Amino acid sequence: MDVDAAVVKRIALWVYETCSVFNLFYCITLSLAIKTSKNNALPATYIYNMAISNALLVIFGIMVYILPYYMSDKTYKTYRDSIGAMISVGVTFNYLHPMLTLILMTINRIAVVVSMQASQLFTSSKIWLYTSFHMTANFACLIIPYLSECRINYDIRKVGFISECAPDRHQITTFSNYYSVFFPFVAFFFNVLVIINFKLQRSPTYTKIKNMFRRGNGDQFTSMPSDVLKAKKKTERMLMIQAFITAFYLSVYELTSLVLRVVPELFGNLSLDGKLAFTYFRLAQVPCHVFLVYFIFTPVTRKIYMDFVRERVFCMKPAKKKTIKVSATTTSTKK
């Protein structure tokens, strides 16, 4: 039986719309939940960066991919000519921001593996500083082509980003398009190495070799109170898992981009409805990585989020902790 591409396109669009609304709500409420949380062990700065950029990505995605679907060709042309290039910059910026933040998270993990003292270089204020650096670089790489004659403008009717000086493109656009696809793969590779290192730490031989390289640098942490050291290691493990899942998820998405780049006829031979269906299904998975990482794979943030939604959104009383009553028993002995 032949599959109707138009029906598949409508299903794909519905899936993308549903994922967009759900993840916009989740990212906003997650940010509020983390802000009101008293858990100081959370990597809050990374969570804010991922959640806020993801919420903005959803908003720009609605403007670029969803609203034009319901417009007439004439209305869409006016819409695209007026703000199309601007919102194309917005959607690209917020798509690249989690990738760059992932690179920072990976560097953080590697630095702590090399030396626990490196955690001093990744305090909350310093992470905000580092993210502001890559945000500035990201914005510069997008605004320079935008101000040139080769600015990029997404066209939903052609299902692609179109250069206004086509077939040419700005050198920065060409460079970023070629290399940005490898960001999640590189991060995934190094996060796998970090996980291997984490598993090898159970080996006494590996620990001895590692301590030889850290000789003279471990006094600060061996003298730490055990509860502080335990909390620090718990935070590091949480970050490792989050970085790995994020890298894996984004790598899966970028893998399809790499395949389409190597074999472009796979996409080019599809009908317009087929191209839109494929695009909407791909887009639907992009905003889900925050929910996947911080709700599915991170029990701590999941509990914080559920408590926040229960109390602040549904105005329910906080869940009571179960207490076990111990009754005192007396024994009598016969004399």
Curated annotation (Swiss-Prot):
Transmembrane segments: 11-31, 47-67, 83-103, 127-147, 178-198, 239-259, 277-297
Keyword Transport appears in the UniProt entry: no
Cytoplasmic side: 32-46, 104-126, 199-238, 298-319
Residues in compartment: Extracellular: 1-10, 68-82, 148-177, 260-276
Membrane-topology annotation of the record: Multi-pass membrane protein
InterPro entries reported in the protein's UniProt record: 7TM_GPCR_serpentine_rcpt_Srxa
A single cellular component GO annotation: membrane
Name of the featured protein: Serpentine receptor class XA 10
Compartment list: Membrane
Domain of life, source organism: Eukaryota
Gene field: srxa-10
Keywords assigned: Membrane, Transmembrane, Transmembrane helix
Stated family: Belongs to the nematode receptor-like protein srxa family.
Alphabetized Pfam families for the sequence: Serpentine_r_xa (PF03383)
